[in-house]
Amino acid sequence: MISLSLVLLLLFGVRCFDSAGQINDDSPLFISTSIDNSMNLKILVEKKPYFTGSVTGYKLYYTNDSSQTNEEYEKWMHQEALSNQNSYNFVIDANKHEIVSGDVYRVRATVFFNNVESVPTGVISINTRQSIPKAPLIVNTKILYNSSVLISFVPADDVNAIENYTLMYKQMEAEEWKSLNFKSDFDGKVLLDGLIPNHTYEIKIFVTGGIVQGTPSNLATFTTNSTALALVKTEPDEEYTADPQTNEPLSITCTVKSVSKASVLWKVNGIKVSVDSSFYTVVTSVHEDFIESTIRAKSRTRSAKFTCLATNDAGDSSKEVNVIIKGPGSPPSEITLVAEKRGYTISWKPPSHPNGKITKYVVYHTLNREDPLSDWRKIDLDGSEKMVRIIMDTEESFYGRVQAATELGPGIISDIVAMERDTQPISVESDLFGVSATTMVVNPRETLSIQCTARGKPRPSISVAISDRKNASQVEVDVWSRLQATSSAGIVSAVHNFSVLTSKFVHCRAKNSAGSNYSTMELKVDKPGDAPTQIQVLSVNALDALVVWHSPQFPNSPITSYIVLVSNDDKEDKSTWLQYESNAKETQINRMLLPTGNLEKSTEYFVCVRAKNAAGIGPTSSLISFITLNGGPDSPPDNLKVLINEANQVIVYWNTPNSTTEVTGYLIYYTRDLSLSNDDYKNWQFVEMNNNSTRYKFDLSVGLKPKTFYRVRISGKNSHADGPASEVVEFETAYSEVPIPTDLKTEVLDDNTIHIKFNAVRDPDDHSKALGEYRIDLAATDDVLHALWKQIEPKSIKIDEISSMVDVEIDGDSVEKNQMYWVKVTARLDNPSWGMHSSKPRWFRTGHGKLMTSVTLEGAPLIEKEPNLFEELSVTCTGMGSPAPIITWEWMNKSIENGTEGWNILNIQIDDTTVVSKITRNNIRESGDLTCLANNNEGSSSASVEIRVLGPGNPPENIILTAYRNQINVTWQESTLPNGDIMKYIVYYSENENDDLSDWNKFETAELETYVETFGPHTKHFIRVQAVSDRGPGIISNVLSCISDVLYETIHLEIVASNILDFEAEPNQNVEIRCKGTGKPQPELFYQFANETEQNFVEVETNDMDLFEAKAPEINSRRNVTVTCRASNKYENVTISKVIIIKRPGEAPTNISWSFEEEYDSTLYINWNPIENANGEKLEYNLYLSNYKTKVSGPPVKIPDIPLDVNISLRVSAENEYGEGEKTFPIWIPTPNGGPKTAPILSSLHAQDSKVYIFWVEPRLPNGEIQNYTIYIQKENESENEEHSIDKEWKKFIYGSNITHVIIGVDDGLEENERYQMKMTATNQRHEGPETKVYTFDLISFDENDVIDNFTAIVINSTVFVEVGNPIYTKYNIYIREDGNNQTVKHEIDVESGKTTFEFPFQLDHTLSYTIKMSGMKLGRESPPSEEIDLEFISSPSPTPIISGSRRKVIKEPPL
């Protein structure tokens, strides 16, 4: 009971206890519980085998009310069952009791012996919380050198990959476990450190953190630091130094010696080398006493730290080799050469493999490609430089190369970049197996062949690279492999064979001195690229073998499942192997229970694994083998015990083996021979027994020696083989057996007749003879210690000669009813010297002594009938009891009421103890159990008969007929009375309802729907359906009818273009489209152009051949356009599409712009918007420049050597591989005149003493040699409305190119007191250049006559009146200042010419004194001011003055 309670506690959160908290061993019942997925509680009660008496029923008490105590169990809810079996299953229904997760139920149970209830079991608590998580699986323990261990495990199927775990560990000899809590990852690994060196530990893992602790994993053991680390040596040893070299590989060899199994891997700069690396390859060979692994670099171009890592049971050991490349391993990248006026510019970027800090760059250049490099000119530059300009006047070919260097040395020199006259642009194409595409799907490890084809001049070389990078220009230089190429008719081609494990980009590169070009193809690998690794078979039993493996390194898309293949012949084709599929996990390690039940016993089997994803199945792993078991029990009996009973007999007890195979019997091995070892138990003496008991008594027939030490062990067996033996138990026999009856069992019959059974006692003087006389003593008491024994004469004593079992019968009248008795038995011996020895007392309880209620059914327990709506079912039941019982009937556990559902019951009482009941039913349609129940005051009894109907009891339901096309669809639902498993349906159909059913057409189907081919359109059809189960055919349905629909013919549709061939049209050409076809009923027609809204045809023509046709509006397009026709009727919706192919370019280029190079007039730049509809793969553009035509790849375009000072016409068209497209309208372009590009730069302009001084510098872009400068001067117009003067009014002053400043004055024709405008130009040997902007200057001057010296000023009220004696100005500036203050107020006055007086308003303080002065304005310049005079205040008014405009502002003057 203790072990059972522990199991229940672990599995279901269940505990078993009595009111005192102890397990109740007095109950005659075992009790166990379980919970199904629907939360139903299932309770199994079993009578303990050593309790005797007739079982008459069971009772289950249960409650979820925590307020009720365990002692009040009789007030709990309960279920009672009548049964004479030794076990019974109770079910507490979850729906009825509304059981939910988290409920806690307590249960107890009792058994009825002879209708007397026993003491209850202990209390079991059932918590309906979640079930316990399954156990993880420890796969591997990797011992590390620092007394730590890396543990790999696989999580159970019912937990997530990321979960909380507890790791329990202890030393083997220790009692106490230690724990480590951790959270798992997808790799399923955990590190346990802090262990003691050279000690053996055992570990287990289980899920924690939830409501219920998980099931512990398998135990794993390991010993820390029991193995030495592997010895690792490398060649070269620690450092390797070499010059960079692209055509020589680099190899490093690692030799590993280990006392245990070891594995080797390489790392470069700390990163593990992948098997699909495009630069590194690793070759490893395993020898008898060492492992040799070599890593090979494709070229000697990369400095790196190489690490050889060896792993064995002791941990990891490694050796590093530092590879130093003395200089950059690749040339500078992205080198470009640009031709400019008077030279070339070379630019570059740093090398991809600098192998240190770049300290300088060396640029080589020459005009003769064939010169040796030593004759090329050389330019040394700092490491920070990224370009250089080389001045050179020649227009011949130019060649350059660039090299980088570090402080360790120079690097790889670049290929030649060139600017040559006779070159042809490079084009390159690639195809795989003759197919050219941007993306192709390939299989992993498939041998692929790519052909690279190139054109160009000079002849290009061809290289190939397989990389993860999509951009070919970004692929590392040393990854490219140059191919052996062949040339024919200007076409260079090369072929490269390779394979890939995962998706890659394969690049073809064509390269010559003029540049390079690339062709790229993406290779998509969808299937798994490699096989699962590290296959292991961890355990094997009779049912299954546990296989674990690691996921593939290159899954390429999520792994959905794994396929495990098994065979006992590793040479057999894999297609014939047994295959088992298991779902994939997200973890690194996966597992599967491989069924072994059908495999041959004791046979070696081979296992391999394949990964599978959505794209297909990957390659097969390496093989691993295991040997199946012999078929016998796969575990030994446990808990073996040896006891000596009261008769000094040896009794052996054990537990049944926990075996996955059947145990049919046991072999009990025993010996007293000390020369035979425990492992040699097969040579011990043994006895055999069957599997109906786990107890064996060594009686005198075995012949054990008295007072002797024996060893015993037990193994299970079955028809295949013997199982492993148990542990060895030693025992010592007694001096002799005592003649005492043992193993008493009692049985009380209904009339209180008592049977006492036990093994016969052997005559101690003659062991071959069994004693036949016994004395029986009874005591009617509950207290055996104070019992008053009374000898009873038995009614009879019988001995079974075969089994030596004694059966003593005692008359029921000699005992009291309903009384507890104790019994003991004593053998009567002929030899009194042995004495009188009684058995152990045994208790039993008598019954009431009355006739038990019982029922019997006439006939067999199974009645089989074919379904019939008109045949009657009849069953007769006889009930007996005291008094005569009342008989009722149940159908499928539900009470039957007389006269309902076709049932009729007739009861006849024969006498006081017997009743006969006959039940009938008016049809035979339903299978089930029919039960007869008899009840009276003394008890109840029941008997059942199974009614098995041989076919469905009703026809399929909800039969629906639907006329559709040229058939009638028939659907239905399953019969509600299937009477077994429905296997098929029979469909009958006919044109004539009155035909005999045998004349109807019929067919069979397993589905719930089918169809019947019609006899013709608009025809009435009659249909019936019948279900057939695994027992036979059922009731056929009634007749249903349906009229078939109109005639149906499949729609066939096509699209025709009447004015073009093969659906190829010119750009913007009008195309006539017609849709036509056949089909019934006649469909409605629709058309659609590209993504426009679908339209229906207004007119549809038909002819006698049932052909329909419709014409769509004309369509034109500049690109490929899809034309769609759709025909739709009540049955079909058919759509077809065809593409009108536009091959030539769809339109002319637009938005054309042009410009000339700022520095060189003869270079023309043309740009335009690329066309939208190329309609081809190879698009070029035609330029028509007057009478000149050229092809270009696209805008912008640079055209040198354009003639100067002329008008040229420009037209542009697009052209693809199918032809030329539309040209643009002509554009007239005036070319530059060749003069300076910019005007002279005026540095100074000022006038003084009737002269103007002009300084300038040469134009920024003279566009040649300056010949002279021209200065233009004219008077500034006085009126704003006057038009600008014409060029002939400008005075020209021409000076030589060596003049940069001039002085122009009155002597040169300029006039004093005038304002002038000035501009200038420069002229080179070809033409005059652009003008500067227009500047202004004047030659105005003032003398003493220009100073105002005769004026007066007075103030009247708030107005100032001024009178000028000699007015020479029309604009005046008047300055008014307060005495003693330097702040002056300025007024600007405009007056008419010759006017002598004017006034302006001004607020002044009459208590203060003010002064006033004046100046005049001439041609925008102010004259010298007059002298200051006092401002006079007059209080009397004066005549009204003339008002003139005045502007006043405060100005700041310095003090006098």
Curated annotation (Swiss-Prot):
One Pfam family it belongs to: fn3
Question: GO CC annotations?
Answer: extracellular region
What is the annotated localization of this protein?
A: Secreted
Q: What keywords were assigned to this record?
A: Disulfide bond, Glycoprotein, Immunoglobulin domain, Repeat, Secreted, Signal
Q: Which SUPFAM superfamilies match?
A: Fibronectin type III, Immunoglobulin
| SMART domains, sorted | FN3
Q: What range(s) does the Fibronectin type-III domain occupy?
A: 24-128, 132-227, 328-426, 531-631, 636-736, 737-846, 955-1050, 1148-1234, 1236-1343, 1347-1438
* UniProt biased composition (Low complexity): 1434-1445
S-S bridge residues:
C254-C308, C877-C932
- Using the record, list the residue span of the signal peptide; answer none if the entry has no such feature: 1-16
Q: Which residues are glycosylated?
A: 64, 146, 164, 198, 225, 471, 497, 517, 658, 691-692, 893, 898, 969, 1091, 1120, 1133, 1151, 1207, 1268, 1277, 1298, 1350, 1357, 1382
Region ranges (Disordered): 1419-1456
Domain (Ig-like): give its ranges: 236-322, 841-948
Q: Which CDD domains match?
A: FN3
Question: What protein name is recorded for this chain?
Answer: Ig-like and fibronectin type-III domain-containing protein C27B7.7
Organism of origin: Caenorhabditis elegans
